[in-house]
Regions:
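N-terminal phosphate-binding caps/lids of nucleotide- and nucleic-acid-binding domains
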Residues: 1-174
Length: 174
């Protein structure tokens, strides 16, 4: 925050920082991340060499999300004319009370877009209770002409030129 008075407790701010480092860790699989808070290592992710992108993502996701991710996720990789989506989908029985375990990336950029979260909720609606959220690590790759990143000052939100096509691809894949 721009002003000291808007800072939360030290523990909460440390949690937010750790979450950002974890998101970057998922986005950049070929980079090692180490986070120290008060001289204690609170997060570490090593570089995994000579593995496929899918294997690297699974190992890194296990580091970020825990061992349960390994047994409760399904790999996804689907392509349309404009979009490539890939990542890990949590099985419906492995769900949460909030959306903290939904990680969404567009061209490796961390995105927290409510429209994408609602698309994911629609895709899971027949499998999850209304107040539950899946675990999901989803990457969308597309041409830069298909996405506008200048919607939000911090670039968290994006707008897609052909959102219906992306929505259809995500829903059909899930």
């Amino acid at each position: 925050p721009a002003r000291l008075k808007f800072l939360k407790s030290d523990n909460y701010e440390a949690l937010l920082i750790k979450r950002i480092v974890q998101k970057f860790s998922l986005s950049f699989l070929d980079i090692e991340f180490n986070l120290f808070i008060d001289d204690k290592k609170t997060f570490q992710s090593s570089v995994i060499k000579e593995k496929s992108w899918d294997e690297k993502l699974l190992l890194r996701s296990t580091k970020v999300l825990g061992e349960d991710c390994l047994d409760n996720s399904i790999k996804i990789s689907e392509k349309s004319e404009k979009f490539l989506i890939r990542g890990l989908l949590g099985i419906p029985t492995f769900n949460f009370s909030n959306s903290n375990n939904i990680f969404f990336f567009v061209n490796n950029r961390i995105v927290s877009d409510k429209s994408i979260t609602s698309i994911i909720r629609v895709a899971y609606r027949d499998f999850l209770a209304h107040d539950r959220f899946p675990q999901l690590v989803l990457f969308v790759d597309c041409s830069s002409s298909e996405v506008d990143i200048n919607v939000h000052p911090m670039k968290h939100e994006v707008r897609f030129r052909d959102l219906p096509s992306l929505k259809s691809l995500i829903i059909n894949s899930i």
